[in-house]
């Protein structure tokens, strides 16, 4: 069922030709270049497969999903069509009671998303007696284990991520497995520097009150920067830019060494721990984009990045591409309109809820090369549909051999 819903013969054909295929000739020629790695990762494929299997195994039961299975509107809509109901948190609400589980009973089935759920929400769900189907990604579980170990050993988890992202919320909650477990979430290097400046007591550093206020929603309850920043273990949301995660870890380690290095018997391991917890799929997709941009052919004339606007890994792919070429981040193939010659997209590097922008005449005249990649939550059929619409805009077709389907 998953294969039938999300397969694309067109994508398979281009892959078989070395990820590059030229359609048309002369001034109308369009060279499509696919990144070496893109689209559904193992964790997403597994989560979606579990959801389909759950519907099959429990055809007559009410099935609920905590949040979204993954950050892709097409896949989530398919879940709704299968009769799976979505449980969303109260708008703008954080804490253990943000989801309303009061309507769940032991006769229901609840699917936990690939991002996982917080420790507190998991305990509340168990109390309902409902059957729980856990699709949490294995790469996420690795990070959870690190944060749990940090809390056990008395280290504050400094998490590089988006504090409001489901995965980061679930990861941070692992610190609460131990009474004195602490965490603080930083979005980027600039926010990490706020922490480092405080550690070192640099001129212009935030006051204690300002620090607590700034990180109010991004740190564990009762977080005390004077007490909780002497021993730090770095972790990250698995879909962040790997280069930035590694850079933050390196700088935090240096900051702690500057702060405590003059103490007798100083041992950096007593103050700092770090492990690379970027998932392999995220790394592969980021590396594939970098390789495309640095290839002998050079960057494509235009890059189209396909994936949900609230997908962290997709947003990072768009930012990477935009450093080298014109880049459009679209949520779905339908954002490309051949008739009007327009494309709707989210400006790169903006918050996930930023309104779409429309570009007219976005495909230049003459032969062009168009690169495509997609986030780990984007199925191949949406990539194939985007290619078809791009070709249609140039008056071309995919020219697939007879009998080879193009899933749209």
What are these regions, as identified by a protein language model?
Residues 1-408:
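The feature marks the mature, well-folded catalytic cores of soluble enzymes
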């Amino acid at each position: 069922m998953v294969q039938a819903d999300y397969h694309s013969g067109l994508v398979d054909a281009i892959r078989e030709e070395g990820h590059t295929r030229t359609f048309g000739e002369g001034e109308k020629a369009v060279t499509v270049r696919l990144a070496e790695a893109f689209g559904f990762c193992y964790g997403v494929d597994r989560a979606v497969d579990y959801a389909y299997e759950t519907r099959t195994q429990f055809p007559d039961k009410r099935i609920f999903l905590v949040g979204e299975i993954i950050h892709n509107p097409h896949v989530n809509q398919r879940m709704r069509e299968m009769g799976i109901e979505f449980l969303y948190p109260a708008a703008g609400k954080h804490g253990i009671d943000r989801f309303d589980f009061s309507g769940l009973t032991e006769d229901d089935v609840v699917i936990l998303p690939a991002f996982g759920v917080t420790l507190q929400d998991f305990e509340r769900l168990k109390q309902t007696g409902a059957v729980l189907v856990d699709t949490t990604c294995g790469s996420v579980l690795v990070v959870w284990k690190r944060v749990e170990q940090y809390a056990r050993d008395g280290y504050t988890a400094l998490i590089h991520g988006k504090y409001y992202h489901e995965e980061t919320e679930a990861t941070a909650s692992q610190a609460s497995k131990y009474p004195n477990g602490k965490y603080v979430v930083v979005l980027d290097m600039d926010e990490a520097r706020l922490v480092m400046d405080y550690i070192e007591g640099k001129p212009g550093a935030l006051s204690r009150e300002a620090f607590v206020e700034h990180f109010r929603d991004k740190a564990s309850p009762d977080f005390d920067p004077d007490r909780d920043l002497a021993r730090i273990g770095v972790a990250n949301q698995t879909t962040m830019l790997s280069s930035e995660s590694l850079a933050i870890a390196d700088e935090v380690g240096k900051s702690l060494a500057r702060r405590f290095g003059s103490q007798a018997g100083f041992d950096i391991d007593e103050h700092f721990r770090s492990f690379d917890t970027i998932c392999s799929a995220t790394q592969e997709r980021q590396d594939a984009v970098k390789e495309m941009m640095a290839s002998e052919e050079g960057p494509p004339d235009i890059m189209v990045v396909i994936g949900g606007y609230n997908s962290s890994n997709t947003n990072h792919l768009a930012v990477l591409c935009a450093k080298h070429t014109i880049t459009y981040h679209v949520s779905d193939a339908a954002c490309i309109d051949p008739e009007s010659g327009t494309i709707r997209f989210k400006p790169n590097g903006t918050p996930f809820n930023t309104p779409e922008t429309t570009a007219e005449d976005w495909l230049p005249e003459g032969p062009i090369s168009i690169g495509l990649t997609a986030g780990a939550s984007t199925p191949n059929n949406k990539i194939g549909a985007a290619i078809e619409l791009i070709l249609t805009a140039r008056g071309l077709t995919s020219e697939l051999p007879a009998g080879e389907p193009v899933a749209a």
